[in-house]
Amino acid sequence: MKIAIGCDHIVTNEKMAVSDFLKSKGYDVIDCGTYDHTRTHYPIFGKKVGEAVVNGQADLGVCICGTGVGINNAVNKVPGIRSALVRDMTTALYAKEELNANVIGFGGKITGELLMCDIIDAFIKAEYKETEENKKLIAKIAHLETHHANQEDPDFFTEFLEKWDRGEYHD
């Protein structure tokens, strides 16, 4: 399995630790940068990770910046990417199993290296649970990537809201 990884200058050390961990587990790592502590901008590296995943160069991606918010927002702008900013195992597993997330994002100054490694390992091993409901939700999310006339429709999510009101979703 190939994992693309990218970060900004604030968390280069953390990225390298995660990269070393992944290599020790036998994964091929595609390092999308940055490679040092020279000031740079996280959108560049979020985009590179996202493109590596959607182009098939990588199976999954990992994005890390100081808080994780910026780089995760950037990678999610790449059409076909479903990235989740996570700080715990439960969120990471939900993202993969229910939403078929293909990138995972972290705040390298928020979440410690060891916890990041544990979460990433579980994320990689988790499998998407394909159900009709999950497929519909993912299709709705994907539909937002391009402009469609019915996207402006105030009833765009009505089907899901009605199911929520009927108690069909459980938190």
From Swiss-Prot:
<dbReference type="InterPro" id="IPR004784">
    <property type="entry name" value="LacB"/>
</dbReference>
<dbReference type="InterPro" id="IPR036569">
    <property type="entry name" value="RpiB_LacA_LacB_sf"/>
</dbReference>
<dbReference type="GO" id="GO:0019316">
    <property type="term" value="P:D-allose catabolic process"/>
</dbReference>
<dbReference type="GO" id="GO:0004751">
    <property type="term" value="F:ribose-5-phosphate isomerase activity"/>
</dbReference>
<comment type="similarity">
    <text>Belongs to the LacAB/RpiB family.</text>
</comment>
<comment type="pathway">
    <text>Carbohydrate metabolism; D-galactose 6-phosphate degradation; D-tagatose 6-phosphate from D-galactose 6-phosphate: step 1/1.</text>
</comment>
<dbReference type="GO" id="GO:0050044">
    <property type="term" value="F:galactose-6-phosphate isomerase activity"/>
</dbReference>
<dbReference type="GO" id="GO:0019512">
    <property type="term" value="P:lactose catabolic process via tagatose-6-phosphate"/>
</dbReference>
<dbReference type="GO" id="GO:0019388">
    <property type="term" value="P:galactose catabolic process"/>
</dbReference>
<keyword id="KW-0423">Lactose metabolism</keyword>
<keyword id="KW-0413">Isomerase</keyword>
<dbReference type="Pfam" id="PF02502">
    <property type="entry name" value="LacAB_rpiB"/>
</dbReference>
<dbReference type="InterPro" id="IPR003500">
    <property type="entry name" value="RpiB_LacA_LacB"/>
</dbReference>
<dbReference type="GO" id="GO:0009052">
    <property type="term" value="P:pentose-phosphate shunt, non-oxidative branch"/>
</dbReference>
<comment type="subunit">
    <text>Heteromultimeric protein consisting of LacA and LacB.</text>
</comment>
<protein>
    <recommendedName>
        <fullName>Galactose-6-phosphate isomerase subunit LacB</fullName>
        <ecNumber>5.3.1.26</ecNumber>
    </recommendedName>
</protein>
